[in-house]
């Protein structure tokens, strides 16, 4: 056996299983790609993106839009009171065991013979979306008055958005758990990608995009041929749009 062959044999023997695994996984044909997912996993991925996007809308409102709007009406101390409404999103670990353990397998629609199949995750997601939609619709008729009288209504505004963030955090727990079974085992890593895309799109839509469409100056400068005195999208109209979604 030549010296070169002996050296190659020693190198092969010195390789650890991890080295071999890394070498194999680095091959282009073994890399995971969205276009290589099965149709079922693609549908699951898109559903996760949609659910995370809906979750990102109230998060963007509470963390971005409302503080931006409130600073024109209240001082820093009252703005700090409102920011208490964002705390539940960081404390969702406290009630995540409840979300994982309590659920309804099926729900019979009153006055009908129809039965809605829910399960462990949809038992939380479906009611949460209904409550969030109704809340958006109700406050859309009062939000302008609440902002104009923010100094006296700051606690009510904080309470409303505290509830919305609790619901968003609870949905996050349910969707995270559902992602583990919605995608196949070898593609479950795409759940984090869906979460990143969905939440950021929802946050961006309810913060940056909304504020741009709500600004008369921005609308007249970038989006209109003729200046007008009203924005393209008012806050009540945006909340009603979110409620419909």
Segments and roles (model prediction):
Residues 66, 166-183:
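Intracellular juxtamembrane helix-capping segments at the cytosolic ends
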Residues 126-135, 158, 231-245:
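Symmetry-related core transmembrane helices of the 12-TM Major Facilitator Superfamily/SLC fold
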Residues 76-79, 180-195:
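Loop-to-transmembrane helix entry/capping segments in MFS-fold secondary transporters
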Residues 26-89:
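Helix-loop boundary and gating motifs at the non-cytosolic
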Residues 2-52, 116-119, 123, 148:
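Cytosolic juxtamembrane N-terminal segment immediately preceding the first transmembrane helix
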Residues 97-107, 114-115, 140-148, 203-232:
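Transmembrane alpha-helix termini and helix-breaking/packing motifs in multi-pass membrane transporters
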Residues 85-93, 132, 189-218:
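Glycine-rich segments within core transmembrane alpha-helices of 12-TM secondary carriers
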Residues 53, 128-174:
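Hydrophobic core of transmembrane alpha-helices in multi-pass small-molecule transporters
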């Amino acid at each position: 056996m030549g010296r070169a062959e002996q050296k190659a044999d020693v190198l092969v023997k010195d390789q650890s299983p991890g080295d071999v695994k890394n070498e194999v996984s680095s091959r282009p044909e073994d890399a995971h790609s969205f276009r290589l997912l099965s149709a079922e996993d693609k549908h699951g991925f898109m559903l996760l993106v949609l659910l995370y996007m809906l979750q990102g809308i109230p998060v963007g409102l509470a963390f971005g839009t409302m503080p931006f709007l409130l600073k024109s009406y209240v001082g820093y101390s009252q703005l700090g009171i409102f920011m208490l409404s964002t705390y539940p999103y960081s404390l969702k670990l406290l009630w995540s065991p409840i979300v994982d353990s309590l659920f309804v397998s099926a729900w019979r629609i009153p006055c009908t013979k129809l039965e809605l199949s829910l399960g462990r995750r949809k038992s939380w997601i479906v009611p949460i979306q209904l409550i969030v939609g109704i809340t958006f619709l109700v406050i859309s008729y009062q939000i302008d008055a609440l902002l104009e009288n923010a100094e006296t209504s700051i606690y009510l505004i904080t309470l409303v958005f505290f509830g919305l963030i609790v619901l968003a955090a609870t949905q996050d727990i349910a969707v995270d758990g559902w992602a583990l079974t919605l995608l196949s085992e070898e593609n479950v890593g795409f759940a984090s990608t869906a979460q990143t895309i969905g939440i950021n799109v929802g946050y961006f839509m309810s913060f940056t995009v909304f504020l741009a469409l709500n600004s008369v100056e921005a609308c007249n400068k970038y989006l209109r041929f003729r200046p007008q005195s009203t924005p393209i999208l008012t806050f009540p109209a945006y909340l009603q749009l979110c409620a419909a979604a």
